[in-house]
Amino acid sequence: MEVNNETMQKSKFGRICVFCGSSQGKKSSYQDAAVDLGNELVLRNIDLVYGGGSIGLMGLVSQAVHDGGRHVIGVIPKTLMPRELTGETVGEVRAVADMHQRKAEMARHSDAFIALPGGYGTLEELLEVITWAQLGIHDKPVGLLNVDGYYNSLLSFIDKAVEEGFISTNARQIIISAPTAKELVKKLEEYSPCHESVATKLCWEIERIDYSSED
């Protein structure tokens, strides 16, 4: 994708982390959405952080961002490299020890999070950063790219949890969803946390430092 510098829009985000499947899914709309999201990041001058794979939706979104001239950081556990890296890689690939380190590293380098359609791994990454936001570990926006209603059932489940008193009404606002990349990124730009955190980000950072110093 060639991008005219005059059409580029300045974003408040330097990097966005994208969670998505290592499969392409059965619908071409999922694949189109991955490419559209990559192109939207390029148009807004945003770099990509993702799971490092070159297959599935991961490969499509990373290739689109790379082809548009933006920086790509892929974070992948060493044990998954033979499975999720095929052919030529794009951008910067950072090998880590395990899945926990992968998620921490992706979060550390990102200003916001977006989940494309995906499976267990995508859901686990998504729910963890939502939980981190609720706990006050970060205040970064979290978005669902709800392609063809893929996440409708998940959103209904979360609304049920609110109805039954397991998630507060304010914490429900952590999750932002939209059907298109353009609309979703715009909503993320406008996001302002309105939920009450369990602890402040500073408290979490101090606890982490103190815990590490005991080793």
From Swiss-Prot:
It is an enzyme of class 3 (hydrolase). Disruption phenotype: No visible phenotype under normal growth conditions; due to the redundancy with other LOG proteins. Optimum pH is 6.5. Pfam families: Lysine_decarbox (PF03641). Keywords: Cytokinin biosynthesis, Cytoplasm, Hydrolase, Nucleus. It catalyses: N(6)-(dimethylallyl)adenosine 5'-phosphate + H2O = N(6)-dimethylallyladenine + D-ribose 5-phosphate; 9-ribosyl-trans-zeatin 5'-phosphate + H2O = trans-zeatin + D-ribose 5-phosphate. Substrate binds at E84, R102, K103, G119, Y120, G121, T122, L123, E124, E125, T131. GO terms for biological process: cytokinin biosynthetic process. One of its GO terms (cellular component) is nucleus. Its EC number is 3.2.2.n1. It is found in: Cytoplasm; Nucleus. Gene3D superfamilies: 3.40.50.450. Belongs to the LOG family. This is Cytokinin riboside 5'-monophosphate phosphoribohydrolase LOG4.
